[in-house]
């Protein structure tokens, strides 16, 4: 099965576009993803990106809840209110919009981070710091990385 793995940092061009790494584009092609669902991550200052199946997975979780429950309402607020659909251009570039910049702090470079079934857009230094923190916490807990 194709997965989004590894990370890569690319520069944003003068028109505000960034090239999605070829390995990530290959996964999108293998999965026949035409439209990207992007949402503001719940934990990290990152934008999570996947196909419509990613949105559908969250909507199934919401549908399993009482529609008037606080959990269902919070999840909908995050998934629907904090999400947008986007498309890559013909050259495999993504427009780095205010939606992305405002939430992540991205300015001139984007770090693409594989998360198995989706990928994330990070401000490069924030990714390095979060990864170091995660390693440190696992080390303190005596867990193998």
UniProtKB/Swiss-Prot annotation:
Transcription found in the keyword field: yes
UniProt-recorded Gene Ontology molecular function terms: DNA-binding transcription factor activity; transcription cis-regulatory region binding
Subcellular location: Cytoplasm, Nucleoid
PROSITE patterns named in the record: SPOVT_ABRB
InterPro entries (UniProt xref): MraZ, MraZ_C, MraZ_dom, MraZ_N, MraZ_sf, SpoVT-AbrB_dom, SpoVT-AbrB_sf
Cellular component annotations (GO), alphabetically ordered: cytoplasm; nucleoid
Keyword line: Cytoplasm, DNA-binding, Repeat, Transcription, Transcription regulation
PANTHER family: TRANSCRIPTIONAL REGULATOR MRAZ
Subunit annotation: Forms oligomers.
Name recorded for this polypeptide: Transcriptional regulator MraZ
Organism for this UniProt entry: Rhizobium leguminosarum bv. trifolii (strain WSM2304)
Phylogenetic lineage: Bacteria, Pseudomonadati, Pseudomonadota, Alphaproteobacteria, Hyphomicrobiales
